[in-house]
Amino acid sequence: MADGTGKMREVLRGLPPFPEELPEFDVQAAPEDPVTLFLTWFNAAVQDKILGPQIMTLATADGAGRVSSRVLICKDVDDTGRWYFASSSDSEKGRDLAANPHAAASFYWPQQGRQIRIRGRAGSAGRRASAEDFLARPPASRAAALIGQQSKPMSELADLDDAFRACEAKIEADPEILAPDWTLYALSAETVEFWQADHQRRHLRLQYLRGDDTWTRRLLWP
């Protein structure tokens, strides 16, 4: 284990990056669109009982180009090549997207040595879709969203407890109450890359690029 005495580099180099067995990826048999391949890989991750296959990392940048990233849940994927996630429009990511809609998302399933990278533009999926997403959330999640204040300084934990109790009471009194800033976002992919690890470092990378009406595919050097 790393002990803070300069051995961190050795510890990191000694950790295995991939499992002994890795799935095959026949790039020649890949479908014409990235959504079909994404669903194939995602379903394989579910069948292999990969923990949290729906979790993705979302990177955004503010108007000055300062980048930040966070882990969140993918809420849906549609046939047009849009990946959905939800958040407060007043959160850091929401403010970033209001100033700069360009965003990137990635899925990583280390037990399979697979990564999927998505780049494009993100925007609101609309008020109705946002309301439906909010009301489908568990009560505790709705209470957290009603509190708001995400990423803002908090004086003490007791403030969080008080805010939760107050918002849980609001939900009990009105089960249809909505958080006005809750937004379902759609990341419309411009490029989607599928990466399959290889023990000999002959990693396979297949990238899809969106055209006017169709997707084109190309291999990338690892």
Question: Positions of the model-derived regions?
Answer:
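Binding-site signature for planar aromatic cofactors or substrates
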Residues: 1-222
